[in-house]
Amino acid sequence: MVHATACSEIIRAEVAELLGVRADALHPGANLVGQGLDSIRMMSLVGRWRRKGIAVDFATLAATPTIEAWSQLVSAGTGVAPTAVAAPGDAGLSQEGEPFPLAPMQHAMWVGRHDHQQLGGVAGHLYVEFDGARVDPDRLRAAATRLALRHPMLRVQFLPDGTQRIPPAAGSRDFPISVADLRHVAPDVVDQRLAGIRDAKSHQQLDGAVFELALTLLPGERTRLHVDLDMQAADAMSYRILLADLAALYDGREPPALGYTYREYRQAIEAEETLPQPVRDADRDWWAQRIPQLPDPPALPTRAGGERDRRRSTRRWHWLDPQTRDALFARARARGITPAMTLAAAFANVLARWSASSRFLLNLPLFSRQALHPDVDLLVGDFTSSLLLDVDLTGARTAAARAQAVQEALRSAAGHSAYPGLSVLRDLSRHRGTQVLAPVVFTSALGLGDLFCPDVTEQFGTPGWIISQGPQVLLDAQVTEFDGGVLVNWDVREGVFAPGVIDAMFTHQVDELLRLAAGDDAWDAPSPSALPAAQRAVRAALNGRTAAPSTEALHDGFFRQAQQQPDAPAVFASSGDLSYAQLRDQASAVAAALRAAGLRVGDTVAVLGPKTGEQVAAVLGILAAGGVYLPIGVDQPRDRAERILATGSVNLALVCGPPCQVRVPVPTLLLADVLAAAPAEFVPGPSDPTALAYVLFTSGSTGEPKGVEVAHDAAMNTVETFIRHFELGAADRWLALATLECDMSVLDIFAALRSGGAIVVVDEAQRRDPDAWARLIDTYEVTALNFMPGWLDMLLEVGGGRLSSLRAVAVGGDWVRPDLARRLQVQAPSARFAGLGGATETAVHATIFEVQDAANLPPDWASVPYGVPFPNNACRVVADSGDDCPDWVAGELWVSGRGIARGYRGRPELTAERFVEHDGRTWYRTGDLARYWHDGTLEFVGRADHRVKISGYRVELGEIEAALQRLPGVHAAAATVLPGGSDVLAAAVCVDDAGVTAESIRQQLADLVPAHMIPRHVTLLDRIPFTDSGKIDRAEVGALLAAEVERSGDRSAPYAAPRTVLQRALRRIVADILGRANDAVGVHDDFFALGGDSVLATQVVAGIRRWLDSPSLMVADMFAARTIAALAQLLTGREANADRLELVAEVYLEIANMTSADVMAALDPIEQPAQPAFKPWVKRFTGTDKPGAVLVFPHAGGAAAAYRWLAKSLVANDVDTFVVQYPQRADRRSHPAADSIEALALELFEAGDWHLTAPLTLFGHCMGAIVAFEFARLAERNGVPVRALWASSGQAPSTVAASGPLPTADRDVLADMVDLGGTDPVLLEDEEFVELLVPAVKADYRALSGYSCPPDVRIRANIHAVGGNRDHRISREMLTSWETHTSGRFTLSHFDGGHFYLNDHLDAVARMVSADVR
């Protein structure tokens, strides 16, 4: 154990070195944070001490940041032995020029740059422009050349298998630098050319190179140096080193020589990681306990459409001058907060304000170089790791509280950083069953020195343009020391985010930093609103719109119209039409009867029964008598109706239609009796607009219905706005579809009658029949509709030219799809169309948006917006914190003003919860999720109670539905979670394009939403079911989807067995790498849902490339395919010969299931002790001990292994089989080629004691048929019986010489092989494969070119010629010529196929040959 005093001096020296101060300036008891030590440098100390074997952790150091406390910790922790690290030269490490593994962050960037990756298709990239004077191109080129020799990573190559290779230096070759001379070009042209260069370079993916320099010579002896770096090769710290070294070399100064390389560093790290890692293991366990509770990344507002380039980054920056920086950091340190965490907290605050939650994952890159060699700090390469912060700002209302929260999150995570953030992300992905990204990044380079050292700016000029980007990164907030201050900048994929969002966010962060630097009070005061002043002004203007109220009750307008136009039609109904006078008389009769029954002003009257025209008179009479109406429809279950009667404090009941079955505990009147009685005189008294008008019961989240109390004046605001907006009057006729229980009926009745129009009543028998609605519209020339979206959808389906009279159509109460407006315009060209937002608690509607050009609505709209508040109403969109959400940020919609309800009848607690006070006024919390557009338009994005958890993510079903409805050909959609307690997401979709399939929908949806939001099950329906009130019937949708999934046997992605050999092989590879049993991996299971990640995907791809001979497979393919079935389809689609992969897969499976002894025996079966009579290159496949065998002769260039499958088929038919190996290939590669066909046949004949296996049946393909013929001649001369020769796709011996010489040049040989079709052209592009193949083919071609045979040479054995009917090289006539070479029997057979027909007909050919053997 090290003594504490000595330890204290060592620690003081190390800390002083990090801070750049003298050791004696640091008091042992002083808070080191206050002295300038930040979190990043503290973490570097932890890493340094751990490598020395000192057991300390970041959290403990951060809790007591003094030299005194650390001395005690370090002296107590020195008993741990340091971990041994393998030296670079240890055995097993790759040598220079050989591939070596990517570092974890390099691998993440390599995977993420592929197009198929979520947020991929982008390289890690840093581009800088330096504006200076007189940079000399030749000096720059010479300096860059020496720089590339000094830093091998500038020559690195990233290989397709996920490794990297540094090729040897190219000797004296100059580093390429492009020079553009614009010195004599007009200024406007100069600007144009510079802009073009910037546009091209700032977002390019460097092809092959990782470092690019370009120089532009400008007028006035000015220059612009363009520096472009692929950050997969070098991290941000390495960038500083590169530029500093380049500046020194340019100035003629040689940096100190390097005795160590990045490759050696990575090999040492890899070796270290093979040793026991107890700290890493403990940290992994710590993270594993927290994985289930980790939050999502910040859900920032994104752009719905794809019209902007989502890959290009833009930059926002602000420079904190030295005075501001010093003031900010001093105030932070005084509170025990490091500068880096102060800046991080300001960023986190912005993320919380502009995202859906105040708790989120934040990604922090760390720059960590292990001191394995004195030169490590001078190397160029990737030394980064990452840290995931679980940031929770819930309840942190002040800047100080937020900074403390972020700092605590850092301490907690950094204390367990031995298990890096990338590994945590992969574990989180496995836990959730989908790829999880951390695309919002905070990068702190504080403590690393100035971004550009003075030497760089002196040599090359001022950095005038900087931009960086990274794969799978949306927003990278960076802080770095620059020009004596701090540069705060964001590199952001602008096209991903909603317009104006990034500007507002960045401005808010800068404002906060300046506020905190300006004074201490700002740290502890409640934070100002995130709502920018301009946005606040827009909303205030819309919320401030007013219209003078009429001060009348709902029914007053009707009675005035009855006096002014008594004979005008008021109601058209199946029960009889009524004029205004007749309707007034009926209403008066109802009022008189109610009064006679004891009704007092303010009493509540229940209206029960089916929908009829008489109900209009009923509600008018109740209101005229001073009562409040409470409707209960016939669809209500008896128990619920009775609960409503009890909860509703009903005083009287009025039954429309026949007596109801509901037990009514109050005096009851039958409407039919009231209207049949003698007319009663009744004069309405003065009305009170503040009195209650009606109580409507709606569904409650607890299952208990809640009664909404609405006053006359609140409803009148909606009625008056409606009439005013659509300019409704006496000529209008309204289709009254809504039942009295539905708040839409308020407008149907009172807006129509107040404006002097007429109501066309849809009665109970018609209200579920859209064709009846269309007939009524056509018959009565209806002009106005007040509909739910579902009703309009059904009406438009059956309209059939009957809707042309419509001129005002208002739709609300649920998602209003844009296609409704488009379809309506076709059938009712004169109709105005508006979408409305609101609830029963907002007196039907509270907002309105009129569609001006239905045919040209933006294609990315998922719904018609809610619009703007009615006059006298106001709206807010409120975050969970209670703050106003900025534009594009979703929050709960609150409504205030004249048009809101009074509360819930008999539910004071619920009323207090939903009707809240803020800024001196009452607001109704709708439960709707909405967001503001930049112009103050409100957009409905879903319901708070439709949020669900999928794979650990909080998901809004409305967002999924919106994305589905943006897809081409999708007419309507509803998403749900399947019942039964699962988190299986499913969707019902209606399409208007027969080409749209469930799978195509899922594939297209992947471009719009992350993987966890793609429904696992998509079912195509003819129509989305709606409730009677016109809303999506989500219960019915869920039941339909569950039934469909149950019917298809696909409840929750169950196991699906492989159906092909290739699928079995792929399953074996995937299962082995995932560490799962074979039967735990189905062919439709998502690889990433099974726990796969980018690292494991790379291993799978490497395995497939190696074991299944599929060199074209890339990691991006794995991310695109995701399932074994899709991967098999992809691989097969790339094959010229689809059966080849099946054959290769069968070999792999056979080997994978063998023991080591089995493998050795299979690789060389003839070397078994029981078979001493044959050369080892004669491959035997034992099928039987019976006499007789088949001997197979390959084609030119062919190896014995190519006929393994024919041999297996013959063995399956109980036939002993041998396949001979020619020289110059496989295990005979070193054997000299035969000079002639005869010599080759003799060598093969002498390779075994063929008497032991006689009689022989010979099978030769192409050239092999000629070799077999000469073998047969030798056998017959030597007394070895030959039963038959099967000549497959080969010329007859007597015709070979006339064919002329075969090609001998490599290129011609390869072309001939492609023409024959037996070799995959992809393989012929592989240099190593060609090197192995061509010598064998050329040797065979030479032998065959010198062969000749007279036509009268015969063998006694039968000859059976076989070929393909589409073989363009060997015709039927050529095969027939074989008949002249036998004195025995001759047959000719053809199969469908080309020259290598055999691959498609192995079993059939084997059966024919086998039959001949016996």
From Swiss-Prot:
<dbReference type="GO" id="GO:0019540">
    <property type="term" value="P:catechol-containing siderophore biosynthetic process"/>
</dbReference>
<feature type="region of interest" description="Condensation/cyclization">
    <location>
        <begin position="96"/>
        <end position="394"/>
    </location>
</feature>
<comment type="similarity">
    <text>Belongs to the ATP-dependent AMP-binding enzyme family. MbtB subfamily.</text>
</comment>
<dbReference type="InterPro" id="IPR025110">
    <property type="entry name" value="AMP-bd_C"/>
</dbReference>
<dbReference type="Pfam" id="PF00501">
    <property type="entry name" value="AMP-binding"/>
</dbReference>
<dbReference type="InterPro" id="IPR036736">
    <property type="entry name" value="ACP-like_sf"/>
</dbReference>
<dbReference type="InterPro" id="IPR045851">
    <property type="entry name" value="AMP-bd_C_sf"/>
</dbReference>
<keyword id="KW-0597">Phosphoprotein</keyword>
<dbReference type="GO" id="GO:0044550">
    <property type="term" value="P:secondary metabolite biosynthetic process"/>
</dbReference>
<dbReference type="InterPro" id="IPR042099">
    <property type="entry name" value="ANL_N_sf"/>
</dbReference>
<dbReference type="GO" id="GO:0043041">
    <property type="term" value="P:amino acid activation for nonribosomal peptide biosynthetic process"/>
</dbReference>
<dbReference type="GO" id="GO:0010106">
    <property type="term" value="P:cellular response to iron ion starvation"/>
</dbReference>
<dbReference type="Pfam" id="PF13193">
    <property type="entry name" value="AMP-binding_C"/>
</dbReference>
<dbReference type="InterPro" id="IPR000873">
    <property type="entry name" value="AMP-dep_synth/lig_dom"/>
</dbReference>
<keyword id="KW-0677">Repeat</keyword>
<dbReference type="InterPro" id="IPR001242">
    <property type="entry name" value="Condensatn"/>
</dbReference>
<dbReference type="GO" id="GO:0005737">
    <property type="term" value="C:cytoplasm"/>
</dbReference>
<dbReference type="GO" id="GO:0016874">
    <property type="term" value="F:ligase activity"/>
</dbReference>
<feature type="region of interest" description="Adenylation">
    <location>
        <begin position="579"/>
        <end position="975"/>
    </location>
</feature>
<dbReference type="InterPro" id="IPR029058">
    <property type="entry name" value="AB_hydrolase_fold"/>
</dbReference>
<dbReference type="InterPro" id="IPR009081">
    <property type="entry name" value="PP-bd_ACP"/>
</dbReference>
<dbReference type="GO" id="GO:0009274">
    <property type="term" value="C:peptidoglycan-based cell wall"/>
</dbReference>
<dbReference type="InterPro" id="IPR020806">
    <property type="entry name" value="PKS_PP-bd"/>
</dbReference>
<comment type="pathway">
    <text>Siderophore biosynthesis; mycobactin biosynthesis.</text>
</comment>
<dbReference type="GO" id="GO:0019290">
    <property type="term" value="P:siderophore biosynthetic process"/>
</dbReference>
<dbReference type="Pfam" id="PF00975">
    <property type="entry name" value="Thioesterase"/>
</dbReference>
<keyword id="KW-0511">Multifunctional enzyme</keyword>
<feature type="modified residue" description="O-(pantetheine 4'-phosphoryl)serine">
    <location>
        <position position="1094"/>
    </location>
</feature>
<dbReference type="Pfam" id="PF00668">
    <property type="entry name" value="Condensation"/>
</dbReference>
<dbReference type="InterPro" id="IPR023213">
    <property type="entry name" value="CAT-like_dom_sf"/>
</dbReference>
<dbReference type="GO" id="GO:0044847">
    <property type="term" value="P:iron acquisition from host"/>
</dbReference>
<keyword id="KW-0436">Ligase</keyword>
<dbReference type="InterPro" id="IPR001031">
    <property type="entry name" value="Thioesterase"/>
</dbReference>
<dbReference type="InterPro" id="IPR010071">
    <property type="entry name" value="AA_adenyl_dom"/>
</dbReference>
<protein>
    <recommendedName>
        <fullName>Phenyloxazoline synthase MbtB</fullName>
        <ecNumber>6.3.2.-</ecNumber>
    </recommendedName>
</protein>
<feature type="domain" description="Carrier 2">
    <location>
        <begin position="1057"/>
        <end position="1135"/>
    </location>
</feature>
<dbReference type="InterPro" id="IPR006162">
    <property type="entry name" value="Ppantetheine_attach_site"/>
</dbReference>
<comment type="function">
    <text>Involved in the initial steps of the mycobactin biosynthetic pathway. Putatively couples activated salicylic acid with serine or threonine and cyclizes this precursor to the hydroxyphenyloxazoline ring system present in this class of siderophores. Essential for growth in macrophages.</text>
</comment>
<dbReference type="GO" id="GO:0031177">
    <property type="term" value="F:phosphopantetheine binding"/>
</dbReference>
<keyword id="KW-0596">Phosphopantetheine</keyword>
<dbReference type="GO" id="GO:0000036">
    <property type="term" value="F:acyl carrier activity"/>
</dbReference>
<dbReference type="GO" id="GO:0005886">
    <property type="term" value="C:plasma membrane"/>
</dbReference>
